[in-house]
Amino acid sequence: MSSLQMSEMSKTYQYRKVMKPMLERKRRARINKCLDELKDLMVATLESEGEHVTRLEKADILELTVTHLQKMKQQRQHKRASGDESLTPAEGFRSGYIHAVNEVSRSLSQLPGMNVSLGTQLMTHLGQRLNQIQPAEKEVLPVTAPLSVHIANRDAYSVPISPISSYAGSPNSNTSSTSHSLLTTIDVTKMEDDSEDEENVWRPW
């Protein structure tokens, strides 16, 4: 091996010997900087959740970060499974409210001898409350669960009662009426009076 080659190898060796510690220090500095930023983020997150952390080691910071990311992943998967990933908190509340109203209507339909007038008043009240939390520019799915009741011990009538029908008297009824087919409230008293008139009609036979 010539002296020139020995000289070049020596220079390369010296360069690596000098640069390797410098690169290592830079790498450690980057790691420490990222860990400090993670620490600040995790401390702020834990404090917002009601936990107070006084001291965190590097391993603790990494463990808390992994746990927090796993928790966020589970929440995202749950939202995706329930179909509410794109809903805002207010939209999620309205969606849950409509679901609850549907359940109320379904439960009322299973009550024997349910008073239609009382059921209509209840569903109208729920519809008015829905109208108060419903923005004018948004639309909601109408609640159209049928309410089956018995009138004067006759056959059961299936009365579709919807809180959307209460929009007719609300300030936003113009926009609601164009986007929804409003269900007319049934005058139960008139139905009962008509049935009684049929029974009381005098017939010569």
Swiss-Prot record:
Expression by tissue: Expressed in sensory organ precursors in the wing, leg and eye imaginal disk.
Domain Orange: 93-126
Gene Ontology CC, one term: nucleus
Gene (UniProt): E(spl)mgamma-HLH
Lineage: Eukaryota, Metazoa, Ecdysozoa, Arthropoda, Hexapoda
Function per UniProt: Transcriptional repressor of genes that require a bHLH protein for their transcription. May serve as a transcriptional regulator of the Achaete-scute complex (AS-C) genes. Contributes to the neural-epidermal lineage decision during early neurogenesis. Part of the Notch signaling pathway, plays a role in neuroblasts proliferation in embryos and larvae.
The protein's name: Enhancer of split mgamma protein
Origin: domain of life: Eukaryota
One MF annotation (Gene Ontology) recorded for this entry: RNA polymerase II cis-regulatory region sequence-specific DNA binding
